[in-house]
Amino acid sequence: VVGNIGNAYTKEALYTVEDSVTVAEISSFQLETIHDFLPHVAAILNITPDHLNRHHTMEAYVEAKESIVKNQTKEDYCVLNYEDSYTRDFGNRAPGNVIWFSSAQKLENGFYLDEDVIYKAVDGKAEALFNIAETKLLGVHNMENIMAAIAICDAFGVPMDSIVASVKAFRAVEHRIEYVATKRGVDYYNDSKGTNPDAAIKGIQAMNKPTILIGGGYDKDSTYDEWIESFDGKVKLFVL
């Protein structure tokens, strides 16, 4: 993984060959200044208010995120979340082939979650891939992440059996609802990557027991009403 997380892309570029595939996490800050950057397969998992202290308006933030595909052609692919209003609208303008995923409804084409099973649909014909109980991740948002990853690999022609086996073996990465330990019957999770209200809400929603939430950080000109509302029925104590 290179880019905004992992190693610097410039360093890894020294070791790539013609058929190399790199996974790049690109921030809105980096996308502001791209010129020739052209990912064969791009993905936008969701767009929610963030970094408004930098971009000032939601419109400017969305424009920066969408620029990831500005150099794509009809030979390229863009993986988008059908349940996000911004990405669904953007799908009508994307220059490449759009691959949808959905955690809430069946799709004619794309990947979707239905009754704890993830499916791949082509022209209305759906193939069951696996039950989410076979994965090691928590939360609906992680099922969306899984579907996006499957779509990306599928676009590159990776055999589906290999994709599914990798999904089942994958464990949460650090700082993302990362299981830490169980002490005296209490499970501890590190979700410090939840640095905006939407990400923090998804972490709370993934918890299936009464939760003590420890939070901190600095204000990025976000609104916190929905985040606080998500405490209801989930968070029994908040430590700030």
Model-derived regions, located:
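Short beta-strand-centered segment that lines the nucleotide-binding/catalytic pocket of NTP-utilizing
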Residues: 1-8, 26
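Beta-strand->loop->alpha-helix junctions that form or flank phosphate-binding loops
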Residues: 2, 95-113, 164-168, 178
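Cofactor-binding loop segments of dinucleotide-utilizing enzymes, especially the Rossmann-like FAD-
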Residues: 4, 103, 216-218
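Flexible active-site lid/hinge loop adjacent to a nucleotide/diphosphate
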Residues: 15-104, 112-115, 119, 130-137
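Short internal beta-strands
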Residues: 78-82, 214-215, 234-240
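Conserved beta-strand segments of alpha/beta enzyme cores
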Residues: 97-99, 187, 237
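Nucleotide phosphate-binding/pyrophosphate-handling subdomain across enzymes
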Residues: 130-235
